[in-house]
Regions:
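C-terminal alpha-helical cap/extension of soluble enzyme domains
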Residues: 238-307
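Alpha/beta enzyme core
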Residues: 28-34, 50-70, 74, 82-96, ...
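Short, Lys/Arg-enriched N-terminal segments with co-localized hydrophobic residues
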Residues: 2-23
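Active-site proximal loops enriched in glycine and acidic residues that flank catalytic Cys/His/Asp
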Residues: 199, 233-235, 257
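Short gly/pro/ser/thr-enriched loop/turn and capping motifs at secondary-structure boundaries
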Residues: 75-77, 130-132, 259-264
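N-terminal pre-domain/capping segments
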Residues: 43-47, 51
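N-terminal amphipathic alpha-helix/helix-capping segment at the start of soluble metabolic enzymes
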Residues: 20-43
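Glycine-rich beta-to-alpha transition loops that act as phosphate-gripper elements at the mouths
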Residues: 47, 101-107, 228-239
């Protein structure tokens, strides 16, 4: 892979992502550090439509809580990345609270670079399906470039059976747990700012009550020197599971599937109640309101100090 660093350096000088500055578009460094000090986690909420973005920002502003606004390749058919990215960046800049514009599950170095060029303040490179050594190599490359932009990088080690569209998969959780020894070397050689780990959560809808190996969090946290850890597959867990994970070192929780279901149910009820006098934009308002309500609910779980 050939990368033109002269072009990248010019673009880096144009980027200005503050860890804790006056602008509201920030990278993850400051908000994760604050979460660690406060013993809470920040939420990562996906932008699959304008309504999901507007609802999440409104929730953040009403509660005064920072969050991560994310776009994943799995949402491409709902809202193409080239369309979503400028909207997400503008939403973050205009917000009254700190917002991270973040690429979720970037599945190639090229996509991560594209996100940075489009103004994202953070990217996730997901090389969890790659051989371990190749995951290290490509993640380190993304970190080198992203840090020159002033952006942060989340990576993933270990894997989860997943489909971000919410489809079900058979799985054996123990097969996917993150290994602490591999995590220690991975973090040291890549320079990542946050690490998504696997300890029993899954993307999408749980087929049965989840069995979470909280001890894995303890072991990985110890091995990686208290690096901020990330939990994917946050939908469908009980409040106690969230708080247990956070108490052990989870500092970012990704949440999408059950929020999308909640918004869908709200729209279904609205359509049923307004038969014969329905306009499309009314559905959009209903969906935005439902997203806002559910995001606020999750934000309060992740940080019990939030009123």
């Amino acid at each position: 892979m050939t990368i033109c660093y002269n072009t990248i350096n010019k673009q880096c000088r144009q980027a200005n992502f503050s860890a804790n500055g006056d602008i509201m578009l920030v990278n993850m460094k400051g908000v994760l550090a604050d979460a660690a000090k406060g013993g809470y986690a920040i939420g990562g909420f996906n932008f699959a439509s304008l309504e999901s973005g507007l609802g999440a920002v409104r929730a953040s502003e009403e509660l005064g809580v920072p969050f991560v606004l994310e776009h994943a390749p799995a949402h491409e058919e709902y809202c193409p990345f080239e369309v979503a990215a400028p909207i997400m960046v503008q939403l973050a800049k205009a917000a009254k609270t700190q917002v991270v514009a973040h690429l979720d599950h970037g599945d190639s170095v090229e996509l991560c670079l594209k996100a940075l060029r489009l103004g994202f303040s953070s990217v996730m490179f997901d090389g969890s399906a790659l051989p371990y050594e190749e995951n290290i190599r490509q993640t380190a490359l993304v970190c080198k470039v992203a840090h020159e932009f002033g952006a942060t990088v989340e990576a993933e080690l270990g894997a989860m059976p997943h489909n971000l569209k919410g489809e079900l998969r058979e799985y054996t959780p123990e097969d996917f747990y993150t290994r602490p020894d591999e995590a220690a070397r991975f973090v040291a050689e890549t320079g990542v700012d946050a690490l998504a780990i696997s300890f029993g959560t899954v993307h999408g809808v749980y087929k049965a009550e989840p069995r979470l190996a909280f001890g894995v969090i303890d072991e990985v946290r110890k091995a990686t020197g208290d690096l901020p850890l990330v939990m994917h597959g946050g939908s469908g867990l009980c409040d106690a599971d969230y708080r247990q994970a956070i108490s052990r070192g989870i500092r970012k929780v990704n949440y999408y599937t059950y929020g999308a279901i909640a918004a869908g149910e709200a729209v279904r009820e609205y359509v049923a109640d307004h038969a014969g006098k329905l306009m499309f934009h009314d559905i959009a308002v209903c969906a935005t309101d439902a997203v806002c309500a559910d995001v606020k609910r999750v934000m309060r779980i992740l940080n019990p100090e939030v009123s």
